[in-house]
Amino acid sequence: MKKMTVWALAVLMAVPVMADTTSENVSEKKENTQDNSEFMSDERTEEGFITSYLNSAIASGMQQADQQAEKEYGRKVTSYVSAPKFGGYFIGKYAATNQDGKHSGDGFTQRLVRLYVDGTILDDFAYRIQVQTNNASFHMKDFFVEWKKYPEFKVKIGQYKRAFGLENPMNPWDVGVGDYSQLTKKLTGHSDFIGAENTSNGGRDQGIQIQGDLFPAEDGHRFVHYQLMVSNGQGINTADANSQKDITGTIQIQPIKGLFVGAYGWTGNFTATNGVTVNRNRYLLFAKYDANDWSFRTEFAHSTGHKVSDYKVDEYTGEASWTGTGRADGWYATVGIPCTPWLKTWLKYDAYRDNGQWGSNKSIYSVCPVINLHKNLMFQPQINYVHDRNSVSDPNYTEFWLETYVRF
């Protein structure tokens, strides 16, 4: 199945790439945006109430300077760059639970603070730099450049979201509920279920990717999207640990505007600091529909490949063996219901099986009214009912979250 997925993507890449020069209104160019595609492949960033003034001032100054610039190309050219778009936001969280033994975790936390800058060079190359801090942990999230001259064929290199998972590339503002699904966190590389020390990577890796949107319709939407990424497999801010590369990719169909269906594939491995290498062979199916501010999204993913902790060496014989099932899967369904111009309520069912069997299932039922009083100000009160078969003492409990989002 892995070979069929890779070959299907390879065949699609071989289709001659041509820009649609007869319908500029179909693929309208949007300056200073990383991805103006309807198919989401990376987080969509926006300026906030402070950075909007900064960006406007920079853009105004650059326009005056560019009026005197000669239009030519070369290593000494310094014009033909867009005004960089700065942005940032923070998410604060209060959490409480009635789960036995977990009350000490109740309280306020800093979920994250992010700063980013986007822009273009020569109009054909887009770049992004994004950094994040979680309490005392400061690290680089994204750094990449993408040649994007044609919507049918783009080339990206750097550190960015893996080509695996529909929810994975979403900005936290756009997920709906107050956290990513268990599927996304465990099976797309956010805090991967293999359990090694360097697998909390926010679904990102370092590598090179080609992607594009094919076959424009009369109403402007594109029927087909593809991505194919070759990456280290070790995650962010670290060098490769073995000679093999991970391959991730997707084929997505948009038969009518707003309806998306498709599949992702991932084959590769991860080498931990103790020298143990585990395989990651995964597939994912999804559907998504957005219309009139109503939203629906569902995903199913399956993984084969052991955890690092499954590797055992007998202390007497020295023989190595693997424990566990070497499988995991998860699925979720969520719907967003528009209520008022400032209120949209999200419902979500989220399930994950850590060893691919029902005895390891953890189900979360969530209700989350999202309160948008301003484009740059959002509140998320959320109630979760959790049924966790992995917990013997208290498998059923309730959680309450309150998250505050501010884009500055």
Q: What are these model-predicted stretches?
A:
Residues T5-W7, V15-I91, F408:
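N-terminal periplasmic/intermembrane-space "pro-region" immediately following the signal or transit peptide
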Residues R75-I236, A241-T248, Q252-V261, T334-C339, ...:
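Outer membrane beta-barrel
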Residues V81, Q252-N355, S363:
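Detector for outer-membrane/organellar transmembrane beta-barrel domains
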Residues T97-G101, M140, L166-P169, Y180, ...:
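Outer-membrane beta-barrel proteins
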Residues N98-D100, G189-I194, G233-Q234, N269-A272, ...:
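Extracytoplasmic loops and strand-loop junctions of Gram-negative outer membrane beta-barrel proteins
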Residues S366-Q382:
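C-terminal closing repeat unit and adjoining cap/tail of repeat-based domains
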Residues I371, N376, N396-F408:
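Outer-membrane beta-barrel "beta-signal"
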